[in-house]
Amino acid sequence: MRALVLAHFERAAAQRHGGMNMSDLIKLTPIFHEKIWGGRQLETVFGYDIPEGPIGECWAISAHPNGDCQIAEGPYAGHTLSWLWAEHRELFGNCEGKEFPLLIKILDAKDDLSIQIHPNDEYAAEHENGSLGKTECWYVLDCEPGATIIVGQRAKDRAEAAQMIEEGRWDDMLNVLPIHKGDFFQIDSGTVHAIKTGTLILETQQSSDVTYRLYDYDRPGTDGKLRPLHIEQSLDCIDFDVQAPTDGTVTAPEVDGVTELESNPCYTVDRVRVNGSKTLDQRWPFMCLSVIDGEGTVCGAPVHKGSHLLAPSTVTSIDLEGKMELIVSHL
């Protein structure tokens, strides 16, 4: 996918220009989703104006049909990101791809999420109406003392996994890890996983909303009925060769304030720390920027914790000032 999307971008790169200001960056209006496991931290921690109820997800940068963000200001205000991708591909270096490929979320897990898995691109295309698969990664923004997550499972093959699921041997099957603020986890498609109680996470993922549940704690959904499970699809999708992590400590070096957290065929994700001023080179079809702590300016305009911006390919450098921390992603 990444190679496909980048194919035309490289040929168009010479046409880009620099010297951009804030008006050239794309500010989007986030979309909020109620979840039975959600809380209120998107309001109390980030200051978002969220609906009543248990709000579990902020879709901050998204062109997915289940949450297509509107452009908040500028010449394209009122249009959606999917519209911009379809009608003004020149802003993305004329790169290929049917849909905008990434989705940036913040998740507030007041309660446990279901034990779940996501398909790869091939399985999703065949079984989910041509959808992308879902590879994702998590940066732990905050968590309660003693918080844990699930990443990976111990069954050696489909038959053993099916038996463990049927017998409810979740403690034997699942790889449970303690987490701390600042931890990072890469979750490849085919990996059994779950975010658990008391966790606030920034998620970078493929633009997909396909989730298969193995177990949901026998709890009712918002309609009072048990949410459906997807055992056969989950068994189809488990990658039994995945090596479960032992912890999420970031060990990559920080170079001039930038730490590369992950780079794979779907995305590259960096943590950027600013204490004063810094300039980021923008050499990609687009760049997603999420301020996760502090405040400052981006290209001269004020930003703060919870601000999200999309830099198109026409923006070749991004000036950052202040004291803040960002998660930055690109293809």
Each model region followed by its residue ranges:
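Short acidic-glycine-tyrosine-enriched beta hairpin
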Residues: 175-185, 300-315
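Functionally critical, mid-to-C-terminal surface segments that flank or help form catalytic/ligand
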Residues: 226-284
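Transition-metal
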Residues: 5-12, 16-156, 216-244, 269
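Glycine- and acidic-residue-biased ligand/ion/polar-headgroup-sensing regions
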Residues: 109-111, 135-157, 161, 274-299
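An exposed, glycine/acidic-rich loop-and-rim segment of catalytic or binding clefts
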Residues: 166, 170-173, 184-186, 192-243
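Ligand-binding loop in jelly-roll beta-barrel domains
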Residues: 99, 107-112, 122, 143-146, ...
